[in-house]
From Swiss-Prot:
It comes from Homo sapiens (Human). The gene is KRT32. This is Keratin, type I cuticular Ha2. Residues 97-131 are annotated as: Coil 1A. One of its GO terms (molecular function) is structural molecule activity. The record marks 345 as: Stutter. Residues 132-142 are annotated as: Linker 1. Residues 96-407 form the IF rod domain. Residues 260-403 are annotated as: Coil 2.
Length: 448
Protein backbone atom coordinates (compact mmCIF):
# COMPACT_ATOMS: atom_id res chain seq x y z
CA UNK A 1 0.00 0.00 0.00
CA UNK A 2 1.45 3.43 -1.01
CA UNK A 3 1.16 6.53 1.03
CA UNK A 4 -0.79 8.33 -1.69
CA UNK A 5 -3.70 5.82 -1.69
CA UNK A 6 -4.30 5.78 2.09
CA UNK A 7 -5.21 9.43 2.68
CA UNK A 8 -8.68 9.81 4.10
CA UNK A 9 -11.36 11.94 2.54
CA UNK A 10 -11.29 14.50 5.32
CA UNK A 11 -7.55 15.07 4.94
CA UNK A 12 -7.89 15.32 1.15
CA UNK A 13 -10.55 17.98 1.57
CA UNK A 14 -8.29 19.93 3.90
CA UNK A 15 -5.25 19.67 1.59
CA UNK A 16 -6.88 20.77 -1.69
CA UNK A 17 -5.83 24.37 -1.16
CA UNK A 18 -2.09 23.66 -1.18
CA UNK A 19 -0.08 21.52 -3.61
CA UNK A 20 1.69 18.44 -2.36
CA UNK A 21 5.46 18.36 -2.21
CA UNK A 22 7.26 16.10 -4.59
CA UNK A 23 9.41 13.63 -2.73
CA UNK A 24 10.63 10.15 -3.17
CA UNK A 25 8.25 8.69 -0.57
CA UNK A 26 5.17 10.33 -2.04
CA UNK A 27 5.93 9.30 -5.63
CA UNK A 28 5.08 5.62 -5.34
CA UNK A 29 7.63 4.27 -2.87
CA UNK A 30 6.27 1.32 -0.89
CA UNK A 31 6.35 2.80 2.60
CA UNK A 32 4.36 0.56 4.95
CA UNK A 33 2.78 2.20 7.97
CA UNK A 34 4.44 0.74 11.04
CA UNK A 35 1.78 0.13 13.67
CA UNK A 36 4.41 -0.58 16.30
CA UNK A 37 5.65 3.09 16.34
CA UNK A 38 4.94 4.65 19.69
CA UNK A 39 5.17 8.31 18.68
CA UNK A 40 7.18 10.51 16.24
CA UNK A 41 9.36 13.38 17.41
CA UNK A 42 10.03 16.31 15.05
CA UNK A 43 12.70 18.90 15.85
CA UNK A 44 10.48 21.88 15.03
CA UNK A 45 7.13 20.61 16.33
CA UNK A 46 6.55 17.96 18.97
CA UNK A 47 3.85 15.59 17.79
CA UNK A 48 1.59 13.91 20.33
CA UNK A 49 2.06 10.24 21.04
CA UNK A 50 0.41 7.60 18.91
CA UNK A 51 0.43 4.38 20.97
CA UNK A 52 -0.87 0.97 20.00
CA UNK A 53 -0.85 -2.17 22.15
CA UNK A 54 1.92 -4.60 21.44
CA UNK A 55 -0.57 -7.46 21.10
CA UNK A 56 -1.70 -6.45 17.61
CA UNK A 57 1.71 -5.72 16.08
CA UNK A 58 1.91 -6.95 12.54
CA UNK A 59 4.73 -9.14 11.29
CA UNK A 60 6.32 -6.18 9.54
CA UNK A 61 6.87 -4.45 12.89
CA UNK A 62 8.59 -7.49 14.37
CA UNK A 63 10.79 -8.24 11.42
CA UNK A 64 11.69 -4.71 10.30
CA UNK A 65 12.02 -1.60 12.42
CA UNK A 66 13.19 0.72 9.67
CA UNK A 67 11.95 2.11 6.41
CA UNK A 68 13.25 1.03 3.01
CA UNK A 69 16.35 2.59 1.50
CA UNK A 70 14.28 4.56 -0.98
CA UNK A 71 12.75 6.57 1.85
CA UNK A 72 16.08 7.69 3.31
CA UNK A 73 16.23 10.78 1.08
CA UNK A 74 12.98 12.05 2.47
CA UNK A 75 14.12 11.18 5.97
CA UNK A 76 17.31 13.07 5.28
CA UNK A 77 15.27 16.05 4.25
CA UNK A 78 13.25 15.91 7.41
CA UNK A 79 16.36 15.29 9.49
CA UNK A 80 18.20 18.32 8.11
CA UNK A 81 15.66 20.66 9.51
CA UNK A 82 16.78 22.36 12.68
CA UNK A 83 18.14 25.66 13.98
CA UNK A 84 19.99 27.49 11.21
CA UNK A 85 18.46 25.39 8.41
CA UNK A 86 18.59 26.80 4.88
CA UNK A 87 15.21 25.27 3.90
CA UNK A 88 12.36 27.60 3.32
CA UNK A 89 8.98 27.74 4.98
CA UNK A 90 7.46 25.85 2.04
CA UNK A 91 9.78 22.90 2.60
CA UNK A 92 8.83 22.82 6.27
CA UNK A 93 5.18 22.95 5.33
CA UNK A 94 5.67 20.06 2.86
CA UNK A 95 7.49 17.98 5.50
CA UNK A 96 4.64 18.55 7.94
CA UNK A 97 2.11 17.54 5.30
CA UNK A 98 4.16 14.43 4.57
CA UNK A 99 4.12 13.62 8.26
CA UNK A 100 0.34 14.09 8.31
CA UNK A 101 0.06 11.86 5.24
CA UNK A 102 2.12 9.22 7.02
CA UNK A 103 -0.13 9.54 10.08
CA UNK A 104 -3.18 9.24 7.84
CA UNK A 105 -1.70 6.12 6.30
CA UNK A 106 -1.18 4.71 9.76
CA UNK A 107 -4.74 5.66 10.73
CA UNK A 108 -6.15 4.05 7.58
CA UNK A 109 -4.20 0.85 8.22
CA UNK A 110 -5.29 0.97 11.86
CA UNK A 111 -8.95 1.41 10.86
CA UNK A 112 -8.57 -1.46 8.40
CA UNK A 113 -7.09 -3.56 11.17
CA UNK A 114 -9.93 -2.55 13.52
CA UNK A 115 -12.55 -3.54 10.92
CA UNK A 116 -10.75 -6.82 10.35
CA UNK A 117 -10.67 -7.49 14.10
CA UNK A 118 -14.37 -6.61 14.37
CA UNK A 119 -15.16 -9.05 11.57
CA UNK A 120 -13.00 -11.72 13.20
CA UNK A 121 -14.67 -11.03 16.54
CA UNK A 122 -18.14 -11.35 14.96
CA UNK A 123 -17.11 -14.59 13.23
CA UNK A 124 -15.64 -15.89 16.49
CA UNK A 125 -18.81 -15.01 18.39
CA UNK A 126 -20.96 -16.73 15.75
CA UNK A 127 -18.72 -19.80 15.91
CA UNK A 128 -18.88 -19.79 19.71
CA UNK A 129 -22.67 -19.55 19.60
CA UNK A 130 -22.90 -22.37 17.03
CA UNK A 131 -20.47 -24.49 19.05
CA UNK A 132 -22.37 -23.79 22.28
CA UNK A 133 -25.70 -24.67 20.60
CA UNK A 134 -24.27 -27.84 19.09
CA UNK A 135 -22.62 -28.80 22.37
CA UNK A 136 -25.84 -28.11 24.25
CA UNK A 137 -27.69 -30.28 21.75
CA UNK A 138 -25.09 -33.03 22.03
CA UNK A 139 -24.82 -32.64 25.78
CA UNK A 140 -28.55 -32.98 26.36
CA UNK A 141 -29.61 -36.20 24.61
CA UNK A 142 -33.16 -37.47 24.83
CA UNK A 143 -33.50 -39.62 27.95
CA UNK A 144 -37.27 -39.83 27.68
CA UNK A 145 -37.13 -43.28 26.06
CA UNK A 146 -34.85 -44.53 28.84
CA UNK A 147 -37.13 -42.97 31.45
CA UNK A 148 -40.14 -44.62 29.82
CA UNK A 149 -38.31 -47.97 29.84
CA UNK A 150 -37.44 -47.50 33.52
CA UNK A 151 -41.06 -46.61 34.32
CA UNK A 152 -42.30 -49.67 32.43
CA UNK A 153 -39.84 -51.87 34.30
CA UNK A 154 -40.93 -50.32 37.59
CA UNK A 155 -44.58 -50.93 36.68
CA UNK A 156 -43.74 -54.55 35.79
CA UNK A 157 -41.89 -54.95 39.09
CA UNK A 158 -44.86 -53.51 40.98
CA UNK A 159 -47.26 -55.79 39.09
CA UNK A 160 -44.99 -58.77 39.76
CA UNK A 161 -44.83 -57.87 43.44
CA UNK A 162 -48.62 -57.58 43.58
CA UNK A 163 -48.97 -60.90 41.75
CA UNK A 164 -46.50 -62.50 44.16
CA UNK A 165 -48.45 -61.11 47.11
CA UNK A 166 -51.70 -62.42 45.61
CA UNK A 167 -50.13 -65.82 45.03
CA UNK A 168 -48.81 -65.87 48.61
CA UNK A 169 -52.32 -65.06 49.86
CA UNK A 170 -53.78 -67.81 47.64
CA UNK A 171 -51.17 -70.25 48.92
CA UNK A 172 -52.02 -69.32 52.52
CA UNK A 173 -55.72 -69.76 51.77
CA UNK A 174 -55.02 -73.12 50.14
CA UNK A 175 -52.96 -74.17 53.16
CA UNK A 176 -55.80 -73.13 55.49
CA UNK A 177 -58.33 -75.00 53.34
CA UNK A 178 -56.05 -78.05 53.34
CA UNK A 179 -55.78 -77.83 57.13
CA UNK A 180 -59.59 -77.62 57.39
CA UNK A 181 -60.03 -80.62 55.10
CA UNK A 182 -57.40 -82.48 57.07
CA UNK A 183 -59.26 -81.74 60.31
CA UNK A 184 -62.55 -82.85 58.74
CA UNK A 185 -60.88 -85.99 57.43
CA UNK A 186 -59.50 -86.78 60.86
CA UNK A 187 -62.94 -86.15 62.44
CA UNK A 188 -64.64 -88.42 59.87
CA UNK A 189 -61.96 -91.04 60.39
CA UNK A 190 -62.53 -90.93 64.15
CA UNK A 191 -66.31 -91.17 63.57
CA UNK A 192 -65.77 -94.12 61.26
CA UNK A 193 -63.63 -95.81 63.86
CA UNK A 194 -66.37 -95.22 66.47
CA UNK A 195 -69.02 -96.63 64.12
CA UNK A 196 -66.84 -99.66 63.39
CA UNK A 197 -66.36 -100.14 67.14
CA UNK A 198 -70.18 -99.94 67.60
CA UNK A 199 -70.66 -102.45 64.77
CA UNK A 200 -68.16 -104.80 66.39
CA UNK A 201 -70.00 -104.41 69.71
CA UNK A 202 -73.36 -105.11 68.03
CA UNK A 203 -71.87 -108.12 66.31
CA UNK A 204 -70.75 -109.46 69.68
CA UNK A 205 -74.24 -108.81 71.03
CA UNK A 206 -75.70 -110.63 68.00
CA UNK A 207 -73.41 -113.56 68.67
CA UNK A 208 -74.53 -113.58 72.29
CA UNK A 209 -78.16 -113.45 71.20
CA UNK A 210 -77.53 -116.28 68.75
CA UNK A 211 -76.00 -118.32 71.55
CA UNK A 212 -78.95 -117.49 73.79
CA UNK A 213 -81.33 -118.51 71.02
CA UNK A 214 -79.47 -121.80 70.59
CA UNK A 215 -79.64 -122.38 74.35
CA UNK A 216 -83.35 -121.61 74.38
CA UNK A 217 -83.92 -123.94 71.44
CA UNK A 218 -81.98 -126.65 73.27
CA UNK A 219 -84.08 -126.00 76.38
CA UNK A 220 -87.24 -126.20 74.28
CA UNK A 221 -86.12 -129.54 72.85
CA UNK A 222 -85.27 -130.83 76.28
CA UNK A 223 -88.65 -129.65 77.58
CA UNK A 224 -90.37 -131.33 74.64
CA UNK A 225 -88.51 -134.54 75.38
CA UNK A 226 -89.41 -134.22 79.06
CA UNK A 227 -93.05 -133.61 78.10
CA UNK A 228 -93.02 -136.68 75.92
CA UNK A 229 -91.53 -138.67 78.76
CA UNK A 230 -94.13 -137.31 81.16
CA UNK A 231 -96.95 -138.15 78.72
CA UNK A 232 -95.60 -141.62 78.29
CA UNK A 233 -95.25 -142.16 82.02
CA UNK A 234 -98.72 -140.76 82.55
CA UNK A 235 -100.18 -143.10 79.99
CA UNK A 236 -98.39 -146.02 81.58
CA UNK A 237 -99.64 -145.08 85.00
CA UNK A 238 -103.19 -144.65 83.70
CA UNK A 239 -103.04 -148.05 82.00
CA UNK A 240 -101.76 -149.71 85.09
CA UNK A 241 -104.50 -148.14 87.19
CA UNK A 242 -107.16 -149.19 84.76
CA UNK A 243 -105.87 -152.68 84.85
CA UNK A 244 -106.04 -152.72 88.62
CA UNK A 245 -109.55 -151.29 88.95
CA UNK A 246 -111.20 -153.38 86.32
CA UNK A 247 -113.24 -152.58 83.41
CA UNK A 248 -116.38 -151.09 85.06
CA UNK A 249 -115.13 -149.61 88.23
CA UNK A 250 -116.37 -146.14 88.79
CA UNK A 251 -114.86 -144.18 91.54
CA UNK A 252 -116.33 -140.89 92.41
CA UNK A 253 -114.04 -138.76 94.35
CA UNK A 254 -114.74 -135.27 95.36
CA UNK A 255 -111.48 -133.58 94.37
CA UNK A 256 -110.24 -130.69 92.40
CA UNK A 257 -110.33 -131.04 88.69
CA UNK A 258 -107.11 -132.41 87.36
CA UNK A 259 -104.62 -130.13 85.68
CA UNK A 260 -103.99 -130.77 82.06
CA UNK A 261 -100.22 -130.73 81.95
CA UNK A 262 -100.16 -131.13 78.22
CA UNK A 263 -102.22 -128.05 77.76
CA UNK A 264 -100.15 -126.19 80.30
CA UNK A 265 -96.98 -127.26 78.62
CA UNK A 266 -98.41 -126.34 75.26
CA UNK A 267 -99.36 -122.96 76.59
CA UNK A 268 -95.90 -122.51 78.11
CA UNK A 269 -94.31 -123.67 74.91
CA UNK A 270 -96.48 -121.30 72.89
CA UNK A 271 -95.69 -118.45 75.24
CA UNK A 272 -91.96 -119.11 75.13
CA UNK A 273 -92.00 -119.60 71.39
CA UNK A 274 -93.94 -116.35 70.98
CA UNK A 275 -91.49 -114.56 73.28
CA UNK A 276 -88.50 -116.04 71.45
CA UNK A 277 -90.02 -115.19 68.09
CA UNK A 278 -90.83 -111.65 69.20
CA UNK A 279 -87.33 -111.22 70.62
CA UNK A 280 -85.83 -112.65 67.48
CA UNK A 281 -87.87 -110.35 65.26
CA UNK A 282 -87.05 -107.35 67.43
CA UNK A 283 -83.36 -108.22 67.41
CA UNK A 284 -83.37 -108.84 63.67
CA UNK A 285 -85.22 -105.58 62.98
CA UNK A 286 -82.90 -103.64 65.29
CA UNK A 287 -79.88 -105.35 63.75
CA UNK A 288 -81.10 -104.68 60.23
CA UNK A 289 -81.83 -101.05 61.06
CA UNK A 290 -78.42 -100.62 62.63
CA UNK A 291 -76.75 -102.35 59.70
CA UNK A 292 -78.63 -100.16 57.21
CA UNK A 293 -77.67 -97.03 59.11
CA UNK A 294 -74.10 -98.21 59.39
CA UNK A 295 -74.03 -99.12 55.69
CA UNK A 296 -75.43 -95.70 54.80
CA UNK A 297 -72.91 -94.02 57.06
CA UNK A 298 -70.10 -96.15 55.64
CA UNK A 299 -71.19 -95.36 52.07
CA UNK A 300 -71.49 -91.66 52.87
CA UNK A 301 -68.17 -91.71 54.69
CA UNK A 302 -66.52 -93.57 51.81
CA UNK A 303 -67.92 -91.05 49.31
CA UNK A 304 -66.80 -88.15 51.48
CA UNK A 305 -63.45 -89.84 51.95
CA UNK A 306 -63.05 -90.22 48.20
CA UNK A 307 -64.10 -86.60 47.69
CA UNK A 308 -61.69 -85.49 50.38
CA UNK A 309 -58.92 -87.56 48.86
CA UNK A 310 -59.60 -86.10 45.40
CA UNK A 311 -59.72 -82.60 46.94
CA UNK A 312 -56.45 -83.27 48.76
CA UNK A 313 -54.85 -84.48 45.52
CA UNK A 314 -56.11 -81.38 43.68
CA UNK A 315 -54.89 -79.16 46.48
CA UNK A 316 -51.50 -80.84 46.41
CA UNK A 317 -51.31 -80.30 42.67
CA UNK A 318 -52.37 -76.67 43.14
CA UNK A 319 -49.80 -76.22 45.90
CA UNK A 320 -47.08 -77.73 43.71
CA UNK A 321 -48.13 -75.54 40.77
CA UNK A 322 -48.17 -72.45 42.99
CA UNK A 323 -44.78 -73.34 44.42
CA UNK A 324 -43.39 -73.72 40.89
CA UNK A 325 -44.95 -70.39 39.87
CA UNK A 326 -43.60 -68.80 43.04
CA UNK A 327 -40.11 -70.04 42.24
CA UNK A 328 -40.49 -68.72 38.69
CA UNK A 329 -41.69 -65.36 39.99
CA UNK A 330 -38.77 -65.27 42.45
CA UNK A 331 -36.32 -65.96 39.62
CA UNK A 332 -38.05 -63.34 37.44
CA UNK A 333 -37.89 -60.84 40.30
CA UNK A 334 -34.18 -61.59 40.81
CA UNK A 335 -33.51 -61.17 37.10
CA UNK A 336 -35.48 -57.90 37.02
CA UNK A 337 -33.60 -56.65 40.08
CA UNK A 338 -30.30 -57.56 38.42
CA UNK A 339 -31.40 -55.82 35.23
CA UNK A 340 -32.47 -52.77 37.23
CA UNK A 341 -29.14 -52.72 39.07
CA UNK A 342 -27.23 -53.01 35.79
CA UNK A 343 -29.37 -50.26 34.25
CA UNK A 344 -28.81 -48.00 37.25
CA UNK A 345 -25.05 -48.65 37.10
CA UNK A 346 -24.97 -48.03 33.35
CA UNK A 347 -27.03 -44.86 33.62
CA UNK A 348 -24.95 -43.65 36.58
CA UNK A 349 -21.77 -44.17 34.53
CA UNK A 350 -23.37 -42.37 31.58
CA UNK A 351 -24.45 -39.55 33.89
CA UNK A 352 -20.90 -39.35 35.26
CA UNK A 353 -19.55 -39.16 31.72
CA UNK A 354 -22.13 -36.50 30.86
CA UNK A 355 -21.17 -34.60 34.01
CA UNK A 356 -17.51 -34.77 32.98
CA UNK A 357 -18.43 -33.54 29.51
CA UNK A 358 -20.51 -30.75 31.04
CA UNK A 359 -17.59 -29.80 33.30
CA UNK A 360 -15.21 -29.78 30.33
CA UNK A 361 -17.62 -27.74 28.23
CA UNK A 362 -18.14 -25.33 31.11
CA UNK A 363 -14.37 -24.98 31.42
CA UNK A 364 -14.14 -24.37 27.67
CA UNK A 365 -16.96 -21.85 27.90
CA UNK A 366 -15.15 -20.14 30.77
CA UNK A 367 -11.99 -20.01 28.68
CA UNK A 368 -13.95 -18.68 25.70
CA UNK A 369 -15.61 -16.08 27.90
CA UNK A 370 -12.21 -15.09 29.27
CA UNK A 371 -10.92 -14.81 25.71
CA UNK A 372 -13.97 -12.76 24.78
CA UNK A 373 -13.45 -10.48 27.76
CA UNK A 374 -9.78 -10.11 26.86
CA UNK A 375 -10.67 -9.38 23.25
CA UNK A 376 -13.33 -6.92 24.40
CA UNK A 377 -10.75 -5.21 26.58
CA UNK A 378 -8.33 -5.10 23.68
CA UNK A 379 -11.12 -3.83 21.46
CA UNK A 380 -11.89 -1.10 24.00
CA UNK A 381 -8.19 -0.24 24.08
CA UNK A 382 -8.20 -0.05 20.28
CA UNK A 383 -11.31 2.11 20.38
CA UNK A 384 -9.59 4.40 22.87
CA UNK A 385 -6.52 4.57 20.63
CA UNK A 386 -8.77 5.25 17.66
CA UNK A 387 -10.51 8.08 19.50
CA UNK A 388 -7.15 9.48 20.56
CA UNK A 389 -5.86 9.24 16.98
CA UNK A 390 -8.96 10.97 15.66
CA UNK A 391 -8.42 13.71 18.24
CA UNK A 392 -4.79 14.04 17.19
CA UNK A 393 -5.79 14.14 13.51
CA UNK A 394 -8.32 16.85 14.23
CA UNK A 395 -5.61 18.74 16.13
CA UNK A 396 -3.19 18.29 13.22
CA UNK A 397 -5.86 19.40 10.78
CA UNK A 398 -6.51 22.54 12.77
CA UNK A 399 -2.76 23.17 12.97
CA UNK A 400 -2.39 22.62 9.24
CA UNK A 401 -5.27 24.94 8.48
CA UNK A 402 -3.70 27.58 10.69
CA UNK A 403 -0.29 27.06 9.06
CA UNK A 404 -1.85 27.11 5.57
CA UNK A 405 -3.45 30.41 6.38
CA UNK A 406 -0.17 31.87 7.67
CA UNK A 407 2.39 30.42 5.20
CA UNK A 408 2.45 30.76 1.37
CA UNK A 409 2.31 27.71 -0.90
CA UNK A 410 5.58 25.96 -1.81
CA UNK A 411 6.61 26.80 -5.41
CA UNK A 412 8.62 23.56 -5.66
CA UNK A 413 5.48 21.46 -5.32
CA UNK A 414 4.37 22.02 -8.90
CA UNK A 415 3.73 18.97 -11.07
CA UNK A 416 6.84 19.77 -13.14
CA UNK A 417 9.06 19.20 -10.11
CA UNK A 418 9.47 15.48 -9.95
CA UNK A 419 12.42 15.14 -7.60
CA UNK A 420 13.83 17.07 -4.72
CA UNK A 421 17.40 18.24 -4.25
CA UNK A 422 19.18 15.64 -2.15
CA UNK A 423 20.95 16.79 0.92
CA UNK A 424 23.63 15.24 2.96
CA UNK A 425 22.39 12.52 5.28
CA UNK A 426 22.09 14.02 8.71
CA UNK A 427 20.94 11.89 11.65
CA UNK A 428 17.24 12.38 12.25
CA UNK A 429 15.67 13.07 15.56
CA UNK A 430 12.77 10.71 14.84
CA UNK A 431 12.54 8.11 17.63
CA UNK A 432 10.31 5.10 17.84
CA UNK A 433 10.22 3.38 21.26
CA UNK A 434 9.24 -0.30 21.37
CA UNK A 435 6.99 0.00 24.40
CA UNK A 436 4.31 2.50 25.22
CA UNK A 437 5.32 5.27 27.58
CA UNK A 438 9.13 5.03 27.06
CA UNK A 439 11.03 8.26 26.25
CA UNK A 440 12.35 9.01 22.77
CA UNK A 441 15.86 7.96 21.88
CA UNK A 442 17.66 8.89 18.63
CA UNK A 443 17.74 6.15 16.03
CA UNK A 444 21.09 5.39 14.37
CA UNK A 445 21.50 6.25 10.65
CA UNK A 446 17.99 7.62 10.44
CA UNK A 447 16.36 4.15 10.66
CA UNK A 448 13.29 3.33 12.67
Amino acid sequence: MTSSCCVTNNLQASLKSCPRPASVCSSGVNCRPELCLGYVCQPMACLPSVCLPTTFRPASCLSKTYLSSSCQAASGISGSMGPGSWYSEGAFNGNEKETMQFLNDRLASYLTRVRQLEQENAELESRIQEASHSQVLTMTPDYQSHFRTIEELQQKILCTKAENARMVVNIDNAKLAADDFRAKYEAELAMRQLVEADINGLRRILDDLTLCKADLEAQVESLKEELMCLKKNHEEEVGSLRCQLGDRLNIEVDAAPPVDLTRVLEEMRCQYEAMVEANRRDVEEWFNMQMEELNQQVATSSEQLQNYQSDIIDLRRTVNTLEIELQAQHSLRDSLENTLTESEARYSSQLAQMQCMITNVEAQLAEIRADLERQNQEYQVLLDVRARLEGEINTYRSLLENEDCKLPCNPCSTPSCTTCVPSPCVPRTVCVPRTVGMPCSPCPQGRY
